[in-house]
Amino acid sequence: MALLELRDVTRRFGDFTAVDCVNLSIEAGELFTLLGPSGCGKTTLLRMIAGFDVPDSGQILLDGQDIANTPPEKRPIHTVFQSYALFPHMTVADNVAFPLKMSGKTPAEIKKRVEKALEEVQLSRFTHRFPHELSGGQKQRVAFARGLINRPRLLLMDEPLGALDAKLREDMQRELISLQKEVGITFVFVTHSQDEALALSQRIAVMNQGQVEQIGEPSVIYSHPANRFIADFIGKINLMAARVTQVSDNDMTLEIDQLGTTTLPLKQGIKTGDQGVMAIRPEQVSVHALARHAELPHAHTGKVLDFLYVGDVTTYIVELDCGIRVEALLANSSPGRARFFEVGDPVIVSWTREAAQFLMN
C-alpha cells in the first residue's frame, strides 16, 4: 500500500481550476518531487496534502485513511517553507524544540531529541545562536531539523532551496539526499527548477495547467518525455515540426519542415498523419568539420552562428543550409576538441537514429 495516495483530487477557485483530477501515489521512504512552471497547481496540491486547503472533490489517503478534511494539526505531516519561518527571538535549539513543547513532551525528552535533530543536520555547534546569526543554508537546516523533530510520516517542502545561491543550493541538495536516506522519512518536494528535481528525486510528477503530465524516474522523464511540453520544459532540446507520413512494423517515416524525411524507430500509438515534433537533446548532436560528411549518419551541413563557452562544455548554435537552427552541447574534454569552432565556420551536425524521437504536440 502506498503511504500517500491522491484520487481524482480537484481544487477550483471560482471559474479557475487550479488542480484538475490529479491521481498519484507516493511510497514510504520515497523522495518525490512535484515539478512544474509557476501557476501549474503544484503548491495548491501541496497545501491540500498539508491540510492548509481542502479539495472540492477527490480523496487524499494517508496510510489508507482519507485525510482530505482533517485539520493540519491532526495530520502526521510537517511543511518546510522557502522563507524558513523561524522565530527570530528564539535560539536554534528553541526553534527546533517548539513542536515538542507544543505537544507537551518532558524537558528531558525535548533536550535529547533536539540534540539528535541538530546532529542530523550538522548544527550541533549552533545550539545557542539566533536566526540572524546564521547563514541562509544554516537557517534552512534549522527548518529541516524542526520539520523532522516529531518524526512525521511525511515531510513537505515548498521550494525550500529557492532563496539560496547556486553553490549553496547544490550543497543543500546533497545534504537533503543524505538526510532523507538517514531518517527514512518520505519527502515531497515542490519546485519549478528542473535541475533541482532531476538531482534530488527518486521520482518526479511533472505538472502543467493543474494536471499531472508524466510520473517517472528522473532519467525516464528526461530521456523519454511523454509529450512536447515535458521535453521543452525539462532541460534544453531541439524541436523540429514533423508529420508522420508512413508507418511500418518497426519504423516510422517523418516529414520534417525544411529538413526533408527521416526514419525513426516506431513508437507505440503513433499512426500515419500524426502531427508533432522531432526532438533531439543538444548533448546528442555532434558538430564536425566538413571533411567528415560522407561517414556521418543523419548529417546536415550548416554554419556556426554563435557559441557559448562555460568551462567544461561549449554550446554551439548552428544554422543548417535549410534554415533550421540546431543547438549542440559539446564537452570540452572530448578527444579532438583542441580547437573550438568559430562563428561563421562551415560545419556538419549529425545525430544517431536513436537520439531523435517523435513527440505529439
Curated annotation (Swiss-Prot):
It is a peripheral membrane protein. It catalyses: ATP + H2O + polyamine-[polyamine-binding protein]Side 1 = ADP + phosphate + polyamineSide 2 + [polyamine-binding protein]Side 1. Residues 4-234 form the ABC transporter domain. Disulfide bonds: none annotated. One of its GO terms (cellular component) is ATP-binding cassette (ABC) transporter complex. Keywords: ATP-binding, Cell inner membrane, Cell membrane, Membrane, Nucleotide-binding, Translocase, Transport. It is found in: Cell inner membrane. InterPro entries: AAA+_ATPase, ABC_SmlMolc_Importer, ABC_transporter-like_ATP-bd, ABC_transporter-like_CS, Mo/tungstate-bd_C_term_dom, P-loop_NTPase, PotA-like, Transp-assoc_OB_typ2. It is an enzyme of class 7 (translocase). Its main location: membrane. ATP binds at residues 36-43. GO terms for molecular function: ABC-type polyamine transporter activity; ATP binding; ATP hydrolysis activity. Part of the ABC transporter complex PotABCD involved in spermidine/putrescine import. Responsible for energy coupling to the transport system. The complex is composed of two ATP-binding proteins (PotA), two transmembrane proteins (PotB and PotC) and a solute-binding protein (PotD). This is Spermidine/putrescine import ATP-binding protein PotA. It comes from Nitrosomonas europaea (strain ATCC 19718 / CIP 103999 / KCTC 2705 / NBRC 14298).
